[in-house]
């Protein structure tokens, strides 16, 4: 498992200094940065391409640059939320999952299982409530 780490300097030469890396292989890297960068927006930063405008301050990117599918954007969101399971991340993930379930795929993932429990009205520690998700998702 790749752990999100705050890199000081150029720990990976593909990304700007100070980036947070969420996932990487030899061929691709998923990261967030405040710096301007020539990379493909992904995860929560690409939700606006699918009709969802988030208010998250971080910007998420993937290299190499390429056209991403909805499934790839959703998978990158899951990777970000795995490493930073904040309520805002989980709320936006739930909204995207509800709106685009058939197109994004219902990938079996522990986070999706918990989101599905929330959508059934269950209380899941650390996750938004059903009302919170529905309130923002309207």
Segments (PLM) and residue ranges:
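Basic, Lys/Arg-rich alpha-helical nucleic-acid-recognition elements, primarily the DNA-binding modules
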Residues: 1-2
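Short gly/ser-rich loop at a beta-strand->alpha-helix junction or flexible surface loop bordering the NTP-binding
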Residues: 8-71
